[in-house]
C-alpha cells in the first residue's frame, strides 16, 4: 500500500495526514536501504521513517515561512517609507509643481532688490485742492504741477488754457513744492523748495503769478532771505508770509508789503511760523497763522526760544560743492525734559483798525513760562478760541478772546493727577447757529476717552462734553467743518480699516458714507458747498482717486436738538443715509495695475486677535505663493506710539514688501489697540512694565502660528518703534535678531513736550520713571544673532546721542554682535534717495543673513 493509500480518513472523508503541497523526490542511501531490509518488521520501520521525515519537513517549512514573512514585511516597509518620503517632499515643494501652483503667480516675473530702486511699484497721486469761482462754481486744481488749469468736478477744463504764460518760469523754479490759488483766483503762489528746514518745512522761494497777464515776481524783496510760511486769506488775495523774524502782508504788485511785527531778526524768535517743537509735536506744521473768516484779521503765535538750548547736529558735509536739499539746519533750539521750554504769546492784528497787534491774555497769567498753546480757531470774526496746556500736560484750558472787549474768558478746564492723553492739535472747530431766536455758540474738538479719540461738542456755557461719535468709532483724521456739518474718517472696533462719516451738529444725524471701492484706508476732501467729495483710496489694493457728487436721502427724525438742549450722549444720534454718484475717475493708476499683473507681488492679510487681555490688529505681508503648510522665517514690524497706527491698510512696496517678495519672509505688522489692565489715559508712568510685558506675551503667542518658523524670528522698528523693539529685545529671549532705525534710548534725550506727556514733567519725583523706561543692557542682547542700529547724523528729531549712549553701553559690556551704522548727513526719514536705498537694502539684508545664522 503506497503512502497515499495508507492515509486514514476522518468522518468527513478527508485524510488526516494529507499534505497541502506536493512531496519532494527522495533518494535513499545504501545504509538506509540495508537497514530497511534487515528489519524484522518492515511496516514498523517504514512508519518510523515517515514520522522522522515529516518532522524535518515541518521544521524546514516553518523556517521558510519566517524567511518569506520577513522578506514581505521588509518589502512593505520599504514601499511605505518611500511613499511617506515622497508625500513629505511633495508637501514641502508643492509650489515647484505646476499641478499645485497658484495660477495667479504661474507666469509672473519674480521681484528683485533692484526693482525697489526703480520706482516702478509706486502709485501716482494728485494733490487736489477745491476752490470756488466768483460766480460760485466749484472747481479743483492739482497743487503739485506747474499747470494753471482749473477743472470742473467732472474733469472738464474751466476757461482757456494759459499755461503758455509761465513757460520760462518752469526753468526758474526747478523744484516745485506746491502752488496755491488766491481765493478770488486772480493770483497763484508757487513755492519752490530750496533748503530743508526741519522734518515738515523748507526754506522756500515764493513767486507770484498774475493769472490774467502772466506777470511773475519774487515775493521777497531780499531774495537772499528764504520764506517759511505763505498763506492766502480766505477772501480776496491778501497773502501773509514770514521773512526772518517778521510777518508781512502782500496785497498787490503795485503796493509794497506791510510789516505787521517790525522786530529785529533774532535767532530764536518766530512770528507766524513754528519753532522745532511746535512744528514737530504740537501744530505739526510750519504755519502758526490763522485768518479770520472775512480776511480782515490775522492771529499768530510769537515763539521766543531765547532761553531754549541750542542743539548742534554733528553735521559733516562730505562735499561742500554739492547742494543737499534734504539737509536740515545744523543748529536749532531744542528743549529736553531738563530744559526751559519756548515762551509763546498769541497776537491778533486787524487791518481795519490801527494795524497794531493785540496780545491775547493767557489763562495762566502766573505760568506763562510753562505753557504751550496747542490750538487756535476763530469763533466768527470777532472772537478767537485757543487751548493752553501746562508743561507736563496736567492741566488743559480752552478759552475765548473777545476782540471788542479785549477780554479772555475760560470756557473749559481739564485737570488730572497724571498727564492728560497725549495730543497735538485737538482739531478745534467753532459752531454757531440760530436756535429759538438766540445765537447758540458751541465748539467741537476731539476728546480722548478709554484710549479712543472721540468727537465731542461743547456749549460755551457748559463745560460738560457731549460725545458725537459712538464709543465703537475712533476718530482718525480729515476733520472738515462746513456750515455746521462735520466730515471725517474714523475706524470702528474690530477693523483696522477706515470709514467716512458725515455728522450734522445741529440735528445730530450721523451718516456713514458708503464708498463702493472696497475696504481699506481712505482720505477725503470736501468742496465748500458740500456737493462734491474727493476720495483718496490709499490701499491695500492699488491706490485710486475719485470725485463724487453728494446726494442725501431724506431721513425722518425727531432728533432735532437745535430747539432743545443737547442729548446726554451720542446714543441719541440718528443715522442718516448719503448717496454718492461718480463724477470723475481722477487717478486709477492703470500702469501700476499692469505692473502688478506682471510681477509676483506679496499678498496682504488682515485680522484681529485677542491674547488674554490684549487686543491687536495684525497685518501679514506674505511671500508670493504663500503656503500655510510651510514654516516661514518671520520678521515683526512694530511702532507702538500712543494714538498711532501701523496697521492701516495703506498700499506699500517698501522694506517689508522687499523682505517678503525677495527673501521669502513672512513680515507681520502689529498694533496693540487695547490692554484691559492699562488706563487709556496714560501710557508709561504707571504701567510701562506691563505694556512691554504685554507686547512680549502677544508676540510669544503669535510665533506659535503653524506657518511661522519659531526658531527664525526677527523684529524691527523705527523711531518710537525702535525704542519699543529695544525694550522687547531687552526682556525677551525667543527672538533671534533685531534691527532699529533712529531709536529713542532714553526719554531725557528727546523733546520735552513729547517726553513729559508720556512720563510727566521731569522732577525729583519722576526721575525714577525716566530711569526705568530707558533702554538698559541685558544678556538677551548678547544672545542675538546680531543687532543692527541705523542712525543719521543729521537727525533733528531723535538725536544721534541716543544711539551713541546705547553704543557706549554695548562696548563697555563687550557685546560683539552689536552693529551700529552711522550714516553721515542722513535725516530722521533718510529722505535722500541714496540714503534710503542704502537703509532699505542694509536692513533687509541683515535679516536675510541673521535669521539663518
From Swiss-Prot:
Highest taxon of the lineage: Eukaryota
- Regions of compositional bias (Basic residues) in chain numbering: 15-25
Question: For this UniProt entry, which segments traverse the membrane?
Answer: 66-86
The chain's Cytoplasmic topological domains, given as residue ranges, are: 1-65
Instruction: Please give the InterPro entries that the UniProt record associates with this protein.
Output: AB_hydrolase_fold, Peptidase_S9_cat, Peptidase_S9B_N, Serine_Prot_S9B/DPPIV
Name of the molecule in the record: Putative dipeptidyl aminopeptidase C14C4.15c
Is Chaperone a UniProt keyword of this protein?
no
Gene3D superfamilies given in the database record: alpha/beta hydrolase, Dipeptidylpeptidase IV, N-terminal domain
Please give the biological process terms from Gene Ontology that the record holds.
protein processing; proteolysis
What keywords tag this UniProt record?
A: Aminopeptidase, Glycoprotein, Hydrolase, Membrane, Protease, Serine protease, Signal-anchor, Transmembrane, Transmembrane helix, Vacuole
Sites carrying a glycan are 96, 102, 472, 483, 613
Q: What EC numbers are recorded for this enzyme?
A: 3.4.14.-
**Any idea where this protein resides?**
Vacuole membrane
Show which residues constitute the signal peptide: none
